[in-house]
UniProtKB/Swiss-Prot annotation:
Its main location: cytoplasm. This is Trigger factor. The keyword Cell cycle applies. Its EC number is 5.2.1.8. PROSITE patterns: FKBP_PPIASE (PS50059). It comes from Haemophilus influenzae (strain PittEE). GO terms for molecular function: peptidyl-prolyl cis-trans isomerase activity; protein folding chaperone; ribosome binding. InterPro entries: PPIase_dom_sf, PPIase_FKBP_dom, Trig_fac, Trigger_fac_C, Trigger_fac_C_sf, Trigger_fac_ribosome-bd_bac, Trigger_fac_ribosome-bd_sf, Trigger_fact/SurA_dom_sf. It catalyses: [protein]-peptidylproline (omega=180) = [protein]-peptidylproline (omega=0).
């Protein structure tokens, strides 16, 4: 077998392969022998069909089967011998496949880029340091109390944290518009559900009042006919309710688990959960900075075939999240996922090189610690640990996460890392 490799464009390669006629002829003869033993033709016993009838009836399909076997086998023999790291599936083009002649074909395929890491010392990472305060825990307790709140009707004016029931009719230039009318609409004030100015226009009014609110729809509003338009809403304020928070008693805290018997227990449990969430958020924030730095310092081309595979993965994930079926998934435009898919492939290649160049292997003790951390969020942590330890697929997933964390650590060891004091809210609610 002779081999000729050429670069067509970017990461695309074309390999011209010649398979000697002796190998082709032998493969055809052996396939005919197998067929002769198994084919059934009326009028002949199995295994006794004459060769010329087999040729007439099955010759073309037998040769196609031989071709289907020879192409990938000799292609992969060739790329393995040349140590070519292929991406995706090759496409074959037959140049010669005739009796008594060499089989000549070409395979077009993509390769993964050769990655040589550089500029790690130029990567800048800001590593937040955070201390969870008693005030942070107080805020979390307030959230829990609001989740358990009741509502009491009020004759006072509307305040920012009230709940109101209203009728409204919206109009633009004196004309009502579609979707701008509602009856007995319940609105939780302060949540920003309505367009700017709507909630603000209700604050300070009393139940039973009728009044107008002047607002302007945002330029990016979803309805084309309302973008940037000035509108008037006629409001009838039917009911105002104040939020009544439950008292912070032992009876209240008992709702949050069998081990939570006092306010002190609740605060301890909240701190533990906040610490776990904070740890994950900090790891994620640092990792994203490392990824951004790696990509910036090491721009690489990625195989289109690998990007397409990742696009399909993202499509399927989107379908699962939103309850779509396979047909709907296929209709989602690739442009929605292309940038993220490309980035994922880049990150995978760069991390693979970090792992390879640093000769990293998953730290089993670190994997056990990660499982213990996951298990601590459950009421029966020992059962969770045992479940993971007996499931090889889950264990491998954990090892992969650990290996990725070790790769991040390897980059951080060479990067420019600075620490910045931050608050819990700044890390957990960066958009707030």
């Amino acid at each position: 077998m002779s081999l000729n490799i050429e670069t067509t464009q970017g990461l695309e390669r074309r390999v011209a392969i010649t398979v000697p006629t002796e190998i082709v002829s032998k493969a055809v003869r052996e396939e005919f022998k197998r067929a002769a033993k198994n084919v059934r033709v009326d009028g002949f016993r199995k295994g006794h069909v004459p060769a010329h009838i087999i040729e007439q009836r099955f010759g073309a399909s037998i040769r196609q089967d031989v071709l289907n076997d020879l192409l990938p086998r000799h292609f992969f023999d060739a790329v393995i011998a040349e140590k070519i790291n292929i991406a995706g599936r090759p496409t074959f083009a037959i140049e010669t496949f005739e009796e008594g002649k060499d089989l000549v074909f070409t395979a077009t395929f993509e390769v993964y880029p050769e990655v040589k890491l550089q500029g790690l010392e130029n990567i800048k990472v800001e590593k937040p340091t955070v201390e969870i305060t008693e005030a942070d825990i107080d805020k979390m307790i307030d959230v829990l109390r609001k989740q358990q709140a009741t509502w009491a009707e009020s004759q006072d004016v509307v305040k920012a944290d009230d709940r109101v029931t209203i009728d409204f009719v919206g109009s633009v230039d004196g004309e009502e518009f579609e979707g701008g009318k509602a009856t007995d609409f319940v609105l939780f004030m302060g949540q920003g559900r309505m367009i700017p100015g709507f909630e603000e226009g209700i604050i300070g009014h009393k139940a039973g009042e009728q009044f107008d609110i002047d607002v302007t729809f945002p330029a990016e509003y979803h309805a084309e006919n309302l973008k940037g338009k000035a509108a008037k809403f006629a409001i009838t304020l039917k009911k105002i309710e104040n939020m009544v928070l439950p008292e912070l008693t032992d009876e209240f805290v008992a709702k949050f688990g069998p081990n939570t018997k006092s306010v002190a227990d609740l605060r301890a449990e909240i701190r533990k959960n906040m610490e776990r969430e904070l740890k994950n958020a900090l790891v994620s924030r640092v990792k994203q900075q490392v990824i951004n730095g790696l990509i910036e310092q090491n721009p690489i081309d990625v195989p289109a075939s690998a990007v397409e595979e990742e696009i399909n993965v993202l499509r399927n994930q989107a379908a699962q999240r939103f309850g779509g079926n396979a047909q709907q998934t296929a209709q989602l435009p690739r442009e929605l996922f292309e940038a993220e898919a490309t980035r994922r492939v880049q990150v995978g290649l760069l991390f693979s090189e970090v792992i390879k160049s640093n000769e990293l292997k998953a730290d089993e003790e670190r994997a056990k610690a990660m499982i213990a951390d996951i298990a601590s969020a459950y009421e029966q942590p020992a059962e969770v640990v045992e479940y993971y330890s007996k499931n090889e697929e889950l264990m491998n997933n954990i090892r992969n996460v650990v290996l990725e964390e070790q790769a991040v650590d390897a980059v951080l060891a060479k990067a420019q890392v600075t620490e910045k004091v931050s608050s819990f809210d700044e890390i957990m609610n960066p958009q707030a």
